[in-house]
Amino acid sequence: MTVDEVKGQVYDIIVTKMGVGKEQIKDDSKFTDDLGADSLDTVELIMEFENKFGIQIPDEDAEKISNVQDAINYIVEKKK
């Protein structure tokens, strides 16, 4: 899975879960500050990333995923 494929799917998940337009999302968008996620939204995003990509994201790692690029990098690394 390429970085671009992961990025596209991460963006799609954010659009679906957060109800924001794809044009509002940037790689450095913070889930809480820029995209309006609360703590429950963030947990749901992490769970959706786990389901979509077939990976496990431990809580200590999830706490470090604060923006879109963090999520993309983490998923790409786990899928290697």
Swiss-Prot record:
GO biological process, one term: lipid A biosynthetic process
Chain positions with O-(pantetheine 4'-phosphoryl)serine modification: S39
Keywords assigned: Cytoplasm, Fatty acid biosynthesis, Fatty acid metabolism, Lipid biosynthesis, Lipid metabolism, Phosphopantetheine, Phosphoprotein
Subcellular location: Cytoplasm
Lipid biosynthesis as UniProt keyword: yes
Record domain Carrier: where: 4-79
Keyword Protease: no
Chief location of this protein within or outside the cell: cytoplasm
GO cellular-component term (any): membrane
Pathway recorded for this protein: Lipid metabolism; fatty acid biosynthesis
Homology family: Belongs to the acyl carrier protein (ACP) family.
HAMAP family in UniProt: Acyl_carrier
NCBIfam families: acyl_carrier, PRK00982.1-2, PRK00982.1-4, PRK00982.1-5
Listed name of the protein: Acyl carrier protein
